Amino acid sequence: MPESNREDGVHEGNAAVTQLYGEPFDSGLALAEQHQLAADLTAACAVYEQLLTLAESVEDSPDVQFLRAHLLANIASVRLTATDLVAAEDAVERSRALLDGIASAPMGPRGRQLWLEMTLRTLLARADLLRRTGRLDEALACLDEAALRLPEFDDPEGLRTSELGLNRVHLLIERGEWGAAEELASALLSTTPATAVETIPRLLIALGLICASTGRFDPAEDYFARAEDALRATGDTGELQSLLAHRAYTAMLRGDFDLAEQLFAEASAFFERQRQYGDLAVCEQARAFLAGRRGDSTGADDLTAASLSRFEQLGASIAAADTMLLGAQHAYDRGDITEMQRLAQKARDVYQAREVHERCAQVDLMLARTIEDNLNRTDHGDHERTSVDNALSLALPAALALEAARYGFATAHARSQWLELADDAMRLVFRLAVRRQDQGLLFELVEHRCAGASLALDRTPSAPPPSPDGDAAASGETGESVSVFPSAAMKVYGHVDDPTTLGGVAADAAAAAGLRVAPPPKVRMSQDSGRVALQEYIAAAEFRYHRRIVDEEEVPFWITDDLTSRPVVQVRLADAGDLFITWTWAGGARGFGTGHGPAEEVDRAVRALAAALPGPGAAAEGIRQAFASGAMTDPRTEHALARELAEAVWPEGLTAQIRQVSARAGRPLVRIQPSPRVAQVPWELLAVDAESDGRLIDLADVVTTAPTSLRRPDPGPYQRPALDAGVHRDPAASPDTDTDTVVLVLDPRIPGFRADSPLGSVLGPPGSDPELLAFVQSRLDAGAVVPSVATPAEAFRRTDLDRDWLSGALRKGARRLMYVGHVSGAPVEGGQSEDGTLHLCCGPGTAGLAETVRTHRPLSAKDLLLGTLPLRADGEPGARIWPAPPRVALIGCESGGDLRFAESFGLAMAMLHNGAELVTATRWVLPTSFAFHRLAGLPESVRPLSAAVVAVDNAHEDQDPVGRLGRWQREQLDHWRSDGRIEHSPLLWAAMTCIVV
């Protein structure tokens, strides 16, 4: 057996002749490798076959058998690249048999290492082969066997470790486990040595495919560009052409069909010349889809038939089924329903047999869409209800599975991008429910949609202790996902009950990336019947597609036990194309209802609101525009906006019910859980009366409610149970409140920022505002205040209020926390509400999860939730470090912007998660009193922001904080309607809202 070691991957050695077996074998191996680099696979295979023939003529011995195994492994590699899967399988099996035959032969330490290396290569090649032919369980078993062999192999640079990890990434992609694949690939990329010149570009390509397949096209192109640079550096012509096909696939998903057609045609020509028929079949499949889009039915059918034939010849059963599904769509487009059903069922049978459950969901969604399309085209008469029922029985379980796929992603950004793809299926479901006029189903759909994801602290990896052997090759955690039809030869697969394990390095990367979430709890619709929202559809989805849709834990859709003192209506809104609304009454009133606002009207009204508010750019410029031209600064334009919003998002029937209840039982409380699209709507301001200037706040008190997932019967050891009816209770009556302390964080001085800078003072010089000084003095007179101050002025612009101080103050116990200062909201398009931050006196050396800003590290919602779990092996969750008191006020720019996100884990929700019962926060960027003075010409003696701070403080001291704040807001509204003075503009006071669970 040869006694020198080398990396035998095609690109991870070099083309120079390496002394291994002697001539002519060494020079022949170098020549074949050159052919492979040049993508001349036929020539490379011919050289290997000649060498194998020569080796078989040499007298048999363990060394000769090893040489033959080496040559067969190389032949298998070339055949795999050429997608000659039958010949590749034969070569792999023969190589493995030869290696097994000499396993017990005497060999020195170096010989044993060479045998192990060749065995690993053969196992990885076999796993690749099994994956390509759809035998995914066998492929995983093969990788597991390789992992068992790996510790014995001397791999100081981690080349084989990274190669094994790459194969796991490919298998996760094949299964559609996009989240787990992304985690593992990212972790591998950060740990793979630069000498792994073959593995690195393939990892980059894998990450690009993951991003493209989940709707993140710019990051995908960035990964592809980096991969291209690496491939050009090694001269890998063949892989560059494969990259071209991946870019074509991305262009197709992005909707750039002309570019996709051009790139696929170029790649197809190359693959056909090189006889890489599997890659050619993938291109033909995609080109068939493109031909169908441009109306070339003949071309689409021809390309589909060619792709299907090639996949079947190669034994790529799942890819063949994908092409059948595409053919089924073409058959439907030309009116051949029988052929559509035949092909769809045949594809589904393959997916079912291979346990590719998510692809089964894609078939079911396609069938449901065809039923809806047929309903739109033809009159089903008496059979329409049956047709709609059939479509719903297919679409709703599949849509639930598709939506639930997001829980495998490690970041909220990736999950939000995935939801943009998955929402199309849920919009279909809502359309069908409306068509069936099923108010009960619509109610349950909205309840499930509004339940919200659950924070999965138990899945948040903590920083691992140093490991001597590392774990870069460990597989990613389960995160099944599905591809959106049609996706060229992208197969999906998943086992809910068989998660792989996230290794230490991958765990660390995941913790740095973002929050982990889990499915929402079951929403119990009735205490008496025990019915769970969508229970039969959830059961069908979990049975058909083997995916967890909801958590085992149940929560009531609304806790009404303590709501007997006044009538209360819970309103929830959900986005599904149109805006869907449900409401139900309690507290002495009974009834429920549903409604919906057409998407165009809602979008138009929301755009008008956005134009009236401070813009998304620099805060100063946005506020300047709001004062100069915004509708909120003139009573007439403000009323027109409030009326437009009411007509678009508020049901007239609900207004009528509120009037009836109010006349009979007194002012009701309206609890509103908005959808992300309408989360900035100032509900109090809605002009609900077409004949007068009556507003919703004239009829009722209004409070915002958090997603149901925050309402858990057993919140665990990290937080105090949140009390749903806390808006009616005296904080002193809470059994968990054992202190009278009020924690005040008032305009803290931020390191590195002067008073007149972007993160400078929001309240002005300490001691300059008599109203604020009087407010602090009243708190000092009433009881304990933290920080301890001798005079009210000392409470402002302090430099010692950092996160450690805040932790100590909150751990000692408090009944209230009031923060007035800078808040930086997370960009909605990023999808990560947990990136919202408040600004304390923390310097750059402070440990935390937010990036530093100059010489300052902000405190993020992610910090408040995860605490130090991602930073230390002995880390604590945020609820232990910063336990929130019952009432919290966060008066800063868009501090309550959480609900604008699909996953609400911003500052306000973090406080509720950490134990708060009520959080007062703001819906949009707040103008300071200084802004009113400079931009609106208000006298310096009038300080609107100070008045708002005092109003919130008074409300939090009241037994009914929502009612007290509402009275102040009605007073402001009355002034606004009577005199129209800018200090009474809703631009400030309508931003305030109380949020409860």
List the model feature ranges, each with a label:
Residues D26, D63-H70, L114-R121, L159-E163, ...:
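Residue register of alpha-helical TPR repeats
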Residues H35, A55, E59, L99, ...:
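Eukaryotic all-alpha helical interaction scaffolds
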Residues D60-Q65, S104-L116, D155-L159, S317, ...:
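Acidic, Ser/Thr-rich low-complexity linear motifs
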Residues E420, A433-Q437, P886-V997:
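Active-site-proximal C-terminal subdomain of hydrolase catalytic domains
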Residues R427, R436-S833:
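Domain-scale, conserved, charged regions that form catalytic cores
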Residues D800-S807, S824-E917:
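Cysteine protease catalytic core and zymogen-processing segment of caspase-like enzymes
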